[in-house]
Regions:
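Extended, helix-rich architectural segments
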Residues: 1-206
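N-terminal start-of-chain detector that recognizes signal peptides
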Residues: 51-53, 106-112, 184-185, 205-209, ...
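Generic structural hydrophobic/aromatic packing signal, biased to beta-strands
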Residues: 107, 137, 157, 214, ...
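Short, flexible beta-strand-to-coil junctions
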Residues: 138-144, 215-224, 239-244
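Short, ordered beta-strand-loop transition motifs
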Residues: 141-144, 162-165, 220-231, 328
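Membrane-proximal cytosolic interface modules of multi-pass membrane proteins
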Residues: 206-213, 217-218
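Extended, charged amphipathic alpha-helical segments
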Residues: 227, 231-363
Length: 363
C-alpha cells in the first residue's frame, strides 16, 4: 500500500480541525451571506434564500463591509503612508519625504489599476470577515510582474498557525476541469495520474477533479542556493486529491502570499469570530418572527372563511364580482373567521430584533 503524501496528512488534520466550525458557518451563510456554502453542495444558479424572511442581517453585513472598505481602503483617498524604519520623523528630511510620497503614489496607482483586482478582492474579504470572522486573499504577480490579487473565500481555506499565533500554513481546496488543469499544470503533470491520463485520451476535458494547494514554511530552504527557483522560504505544492494523488506542481514564494485576517479571536482558536456570530440568535429569531407575522397578516387581509354546511355542494366564487347563491329564507352566509391576532405587536417585536442586529453590525 503506497504511503500517503505527508502534506496531505497535514491537510487532513487541518480539515478535521475546521469541521467544528462548518455547521456554524453554514447557518450564518444561509441567513447572512447566501452565496457561501460549507456543508451543502448546491448547483450553480440555484435559489439560496429560502430561509430568509427578513433580510436585515444580509443588508447589515453588506453595509458594514462597504463601510470598512470606504474607511480603510478608499480608492479616492491616499489611505496609507510610508515610513523608513528607525527614522522618527522623515519630515525633517525633505528629499526623503518627497521620495516616500512618490513611491506611495506609485503604489496607489497599482492598487487602483483594474488589472490588479484589488478593490473587488478586498470587498469579498470584508464580506467574509464581517459574516464569519475570517477573511483571506492571495497576492501574486502576473506575467508582467504586476501585483495581482485574488479572492480566496472561506469555504476553500484551511489555515494553521505558528507558535506566535500567526497564520503560516494555508491549504486551498478547489476544483478544476481537465481543460483548466492542463492549462495550469501541463500535459506531463496530468499524465502522472492514470485516471486523468485515461480521460485525456478519451478527450474528456469537462470532467472536474478536486485539488489541494499547500503553502507552508519550507524546512529545506537554503539561502545560499538562490539560483534554484524552487528553493524559497515558502513552498507551494498542488496535489490531485483523488485516486493516486500525484503532485502536480512544486514551487515557492519569497514571502507568505496569503493575507489572512480575523475579526476577533478567542484564545486557542484558529479561526475568527465576527459580528454575525455575536448576534446569530437574534438573526434566527427574526426569521421565525417574520414568518409568523406574515402568516398573521395574511389571516387579517385574507382571512379563513366560515361556510354554511351545504356550501360544499355549491361552488364558492371568491374572485371580484363573483356570484354566490344562498337558500331563500335562511340567514346563512359566508363569513370570515376573525382571529384577533395582534400583528402590530409582532411588528414591534421585529423592530426590536432588527435594531439589535443593526447595532451588532455597527449601523
Amino acid at each position: 500500500m503506497p504511503q500517503k503524501d505527508p502534506i496531505l496528512q497535514v491537510f487532513e488534520k487541518a480539515q478535521a480541525e475546521r469541521q467544528n466550525w462548518e455547521a456554524l458557518w453554514q447557518d450564518i451563510a444561509e441567513l447572512v451571506l447566501p452565496r457561501r456554502d460549507f456543508t451543502v453542495d448546491r448547483t450553480k444558479g440555484s435559489e439560496r434564500q429560502s430561509r430568509i424572511f427578513d433580510a436585515t442581517a444580509q443588508s447589515a453585513n453588506s453595509m458594514l463591509a462597504a463601510g470598512l472598505q470606504q474607511f480603510m481602503v478608499n480608492p479616492q483617498s491616499k489611505w496609507f503612508q510610508l515610513r523608513v524604519p528607525g527614522i522618527e520623523n522623515e519630515g525633517q528630511d525633505r528629499d526623503a519625504a518627497q521620495w516616500l510620497a512618490q513611491v506611495r503614489d506609485l503604489m496607489l496607482a497599482e492598487f487602483n489599476a483594474p488589472e490588479t483586482n484589488f478593490y473587488p478582492t478586498v470587498h469579498e474579504g470584508f464580506m467574509d470577515v464581517t459574516a464569519f470572522g475570517t477573511m483571506s486573499f492571495f497576492l501574486a504577480s502576473d506575467e508582467n510582474g504586476r501585483p495581482m490579487f485574488q479572492s480566496r473565500p472561506l469555504p476553500e481555506a484551511f489555515i494553521q498557525e505558528n507558535a506566535r499565533g500567526k497564520v503560516d500554513t494555508y491549504f486551498r481546496k478547489y476544483t478544476m476541469n481537465n481543460r483548466q488543469a492542463t492549462q495550469e499544470f501541463g500535459t506531463e503533470a496530468m499524465r502522472q495520474s492514470r485516471a486523468l491520463s485515461r480521460e485525456l485520451d478519451k478527450g474528456d476535458l469537462s470532467k472536474e477533479h478536486e485539488y489541494v494547494q499547500a503553502v507552508m514554511p519550507n524546512s529545506y530552504f537554503d539561502a545560499t542556493k538562490h539560483q534554484i527557483t524552487s528553493n524559497k522560504p515558502w513552498m507551494s505544492v498542488h496535489i490531485l486529491n483523488e485516486a493516486d494523488k500525484p503532485r502536480m506542481r512544486f514551487s515557492g514564494f519569497d514571502s507568505f502570499p496569503f493575507i489572512v485576517s480575523r475579526w476577533s479571536k478567542m484564545t486557542g482558536e484558529t479561526y475568527g469570530r465576527g459580528p454575525a456570530m455575536q448576534v446569530l440568535p437574534d438573526i434566527r429569531m427574526l426569521q421565525e418572527m417574520s414568518k409568523t407575522v406574515i402568516k398573521s397578516a395574511q389571516k387579517v387581509v385574507d382571512p379563513p372563511l366560515q361556510v354554511p354546511d351545504d356550501g360544499f355542494l355549491n361552488p364558492i366564487r371568491m374572485h371580484p364580482g363573483g356570484l354566490n347563491y344562498k337558500r331563500t329564507g335562511t340567514n346563512e352566509q359566508i363569513e370570515p373567521i376573525i382571529t384577533n391576532g395582534r400583528v402590530d405587536v409582532g411588528i414591534d417585536m421585529i423592530r426590536d430584533r432588527q435594531a439589535a442586529v443593526q447595532q451588532a453590525f455597527m449601523l
